[in-house]
C-alpha cells in the first residue's frame, strides 16, 4: 500500500527483487524530499513532502497521551539519554541507586530506579550508554 512504512531485509529495492513489483517505486526514509506531482498519494500521507530521516534510529511507538513519553509529536526525533548518577563519594558495596527519569516525576509512569553494586570508590558523574540488541533493516515506503 502506498504510504505505509515497512522494513525490508535487502539493500536492493523490492521492485528489483520481486518481478511482480517491478512497476512500483519505493523510497528510503533518509530525509529526502519528494515531489507531490510525482507521488500524489504519498504526499497525502507526508504533506511536508519530506520523508523522515530514520537511518540508524530506533522506532518508538507514539505516546498519544499515555504519559510515558509526553509532549512528543508524531514523526519527531528524540536524542538518546544516558543513565547517570551523581557520585559525591561512592564506596564499595551494594545499594547505590541510579534514577532514570528522563524529566518524569518520581510518582509518574516511566520513572525507574536501578540499584547496582560498586567494586570501586570514586567521585564525579558516571555515564553509561545503553543500546539494546538489534538487527539492521532497510526502512522503506512504497511511493507509486
Where are these regions (language model features)?
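Low-complexity Ser/Thr/Gly/Asn-rich repetitive segments
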Residues: 1-144
